[in-house]
Regions:
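Structural transition elements
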Residues: 1-11, 29-35
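Surface-exposed acidic, glycine-flexible loop patches that form ligand/cofactor-binding
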Residues: 11-19
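Active-site lining segments that contact anionic ligands and/or coordinate catalytic metals
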Residues: 20-22, 49, 140-142
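Short, well-ordered beta-strand elements
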Residues: 20-29, 52-55
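Detector for C-terminal structural segments
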Residues: 31-43, 64-184
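Short alpha-helix C-terminal cap/hinge motif
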Residues: 39-54
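Short beta-strand and adjacent tight-turn residues that come in two discontinuous sequence segments
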Residues: 53, 57, 75-76
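Histidine-bearing beta->alpha loop at or near hydrolase active sites
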Residues: 59-62
Length: 184
């Protein structure tokens, strides 16, 4: 919501981005990430009047700097390990190795711990929802920008083709090639 962002910037003393401190956005030097960084930079300038310096880095350097907390803005990519909100929310626990922005919120940690112990799925999801609300409302934790997808062309000779939705991988265990009943 660019209008709301402009309003909040003005309330913070930066009308139209004037006087806003310099920001550097670090990202891996891959084409997709470069394209995305340039698009974000243009949107921040056009919508908010904020100048953002772009810094492309080798993947290993970018990850190491992010993990050490040496960044203002950084690109992070995450693919779910399993189809559950916990796989995304767990990385913001205070003691999680993927907590690159060093979120430290006892209330959030407690809700996540409770969700991990809860056996009732409905109650567990409610705890996860509460934890997510704490992140969204009380912390600047991360902003989902991109959701990748794949397109698969599958021969009509293949049956039982199935994608694992959490990792976008083909489940090959039950794939069948051709009609085995017509063999002689």
């Amino acid at each position: 919501d660019p209008d709301k962002a402009k309003e909040l910037l003005a309330e913070a003393g930066y009308p139209d981005g004037e006087g806003f401190p310099a920001i550097t956005y670090k990202y891996p030097s891959l084409q997709l990430d470069s394209d995305m960084a340039q698009a974000l930079q243009a949107q921040w300038k056009t919508n908010l009047g904020i100048e953002v310096e772009l810094q492309a880095e080798e993947q290993q350097v970018q990850v190491a700097e992010r993990r050490s907390g040496d960044f203002q803005l950084a690109r992070m990519r995450w693919t779910a390990d399993f189809t559950d909100p916990f796989t995304f929310l767990s990385m913001y626990r205070s003691n999680d190795s993927y907590n690159d922005n060093k979120t430290n919120c006892p209330e959030y940690d407690e809700l996540m711990a409770q969700s991990n112990e809860e056996s009732d799925p409905t109650a567990r999801f409610e705890l996860l929802h509460q934890a997510e609300s704490v992140l969204v409302n009380d912390y600047c934790f991360g902003v989902p920008v991109l959701n990748s997808s794949n397109i698969y062309l599958v021969s009509t000779d293949i049956t039982n083709f199935e994608i694992d939705p959490s990792r976008n991988m083909i489940r090959t265990k039950y794939l069948v090639l051709g009609d085995s009943s017509s063999e002689s």
